Amino acid sequence: MSGVLSAPAAGALRALRLVRWASRSPPPPPSGRARAQLAAEGDEEDDPHLPLRFSSSRAAPPRWTVKQSLGTGQQRPWWVVLPLSFSLMALVIWCFFRRETSADQWLRQMLLEEVPEPSDASEKPGAPVAHGART
């Protein structure tokens, strides 16, 4: 039980850690000369403030393949694919051969109906200018 802290003590310990973490100031960014010197020396791996390069790391494969991304089992088994394929084919065939209903007629009428374009009489030459219109 000596390793277990009471609730107030644990809270105080967390607060101390937070204060210690917040009091750390980030290091100043390297100046132009220092940045150029780092690039020239090639010490990028030693500087913890620079981002890691994946292409030069050991994690980067020498050659990328699809198998590495998708894994070896990228194909689904036929018993998973076939029922879905047959269900979708049956739905398309049913939609093609079914009888037309009143809902289909209404939808066709709404989609094929031509809406007359609003005629703007003020655009015709010689038409009187509307009150307050800018010319």
Swiss-Prot record:
Secretion signal: which residues? 1-17
Residues assigned to the Mitochondrial intermembrane compartment are 98-135
tRNA-binding in keyword set: no
In the bilayer, the protein is annotated as: Single-pass type I membrane protein
Q: Where is this region: Disordered?
A: 21-58, 115-135
**Which residues point to the Mitochondrial matrix side?**
18-76
Cellular location of this protein? Mitochondrion inner membrane
Spans traversing the lipid bilayer: 77-97
Q: What are its GO cellular component terms? A: mitochondrial inner membrane
> Family assignment?
Belongs to the UQCC4 family.
Function of the protein: Required for the assembly and stability of the mitochondrial ubiquinol-cytochrome c reductase complex (complex III or cytochrome b-c1 complex), a multisubunit transmembrane complex that is part of the mitochondrial electron transport chain (ETC) which drives oxidative phosphorylation.
How would you summarize the oligomeric state and partners of this protein?
Answer: Forms a complex, named COMB/coordinator of mitochondrial CYTB biogenesis, composed of UQCC1, UQCC2, UQCC4, UQCC5 and UQCC6; stabilizes nascent cytochrome b/MT-CYB and promotes its membrane insertion. Forms a complex, named COMA, composed of UQCC1, UQCC2 and UQCC4; activates MT-CYB translation. Forms a complex, named COMC, composed of UQCC1, UQCC2; UQCC3 and UQCC4; mediates MT-CYB hemylation and association with the first nuclear-encoded complex III subunit UQCRQ. Complexes COMA and COMB are bound to the mitochondrion inner membrane by UQCC4.
Q: What is this protein called?
A: Ubiquinol-cytochrome c reductase complex assembly factor 4
